[in-house]
Amino acid sequence: EEMKSFNNEYFKQLTFVKHILNYPWSSAGEDMFFSNLKQNDIKALDYIKNVEDKLENSSYGHDEAKKSLLQIIGKWISNPNSQGTSFGLVGPPGVGKTLLAKSVSEALDIPFAQITLGGQNDGEILHGHGYTYSGSQPGMIIKKMAEMGKSRCILYFDELDKACSKHGQVNEITSILIHLTDPNMNNSFQDRFFQGVDFPLDKVIMMFSYNDSSLVDSILLDRIKEINVSPYTISDKIEIIKNFTLPELKKSIGFDEIDIKITKNIIEYIIENYTMEAGVRNIKRKIEEILLTLNLDKICKKGLFAKNRKSIVLTEKIIKDILKLPISDITDIHLKPEIGIINGLYATTGGSGGIIPIQVFINASSATGE
């Protein structure tokens, strides 16, 4: 009997059927690909080399992470039926954790889906609502798997350390993720919407990103291979700006016909005077602001483009004219020794730090009367 679209249950049952049909139940085809590589050493070597090249070209640095991912590929080739794994990318904001995860997807030519956990406090976002509830939906895990349509894929959970506990109770999200990362249990993941249906997730690469591992549940952390994504050095940032950010922004803005020259010294000047970060987000915004300003001048034929120039060499004066005063204010502190005061160093999980004065003084004690 056909159910009409005006029936209250129509769209709920349609959602149920669509997700069941679109879910990647079998990995036979994907396993066969790696089985063929196992039988041919030359093809296997070419495949690994191709993946390695793609990783190098798509993101700068992160050698430890790339090495770990190549090891997983090696395992898939040696044992095509092998399971996925769980990675934790820990590091300050802006150091390229999400970019790295996406570049892995592109290098392996497998689907990628992102689930943001920041601010979430209910497990329903991951394992859905009970089917009998009005307006119930599957959780994000099954939704994303059905969208990707392949059992070998990447599920990327962003901001793991910012997932909230619910009213002081056991954190539902953490409990679900502990089950998800257990290799003995994740071949039978259950979503509340599908009441008793076991979904295999054992071929999936689970990737988690977080800034502070001390905020992550210890049981969950024990099941994750943690990879430290370190803050960029100034030389790292310079290479990223010259080889990745500048070409990307020029293409995005449509500035390809203009030759923009920026020296390492100028990039370093912008970094040290207009940004305070471990990553490259703010420096990218500053470079973008410079290019957008120059692009508008080019269109209006004013400023540096009053004479229809085809080449621009960025200087400190141009930077100051566009970005105005630097945000960094370098001051000398404690020019002479002072009794009871020393300088200490501080560091934040955001990758920044500095000098902080530490002072020792004595308070009168009410207990002794002194």
Predicted region positions:
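Conserved C-terminal "switch" segment of AAA+ ATPases
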Residues: 149, 212-222, 226-285, 296-308
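AAA+/SF3 P-loop NTPase mechanochemical coupling elements
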Residues: 148-152, 189-209, 258-262, 314
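Extended, charged alpha-helical coiled-coil/arm scaffolds that mediate oligomerization and mechanical coupling
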Residues: 1-78
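C-terminal engagement/docking regions of AAA+ P-loop ATPases
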Residues: 281, 285-370
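Conserved catalytic/switch belt of AAA+ P-loop NTPases
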Residues: 157-199, 222
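Walker A/P-loop
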Residues: 82-117, 146-147, 178
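AAA+/P-loop NTPase substrate/partner-engagement loops
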Residues: 107-137, 144, 236
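Pre-Walker A (Motif I) flank of P-loop NTPase domains
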Residues: 81-87, 151-153, 204
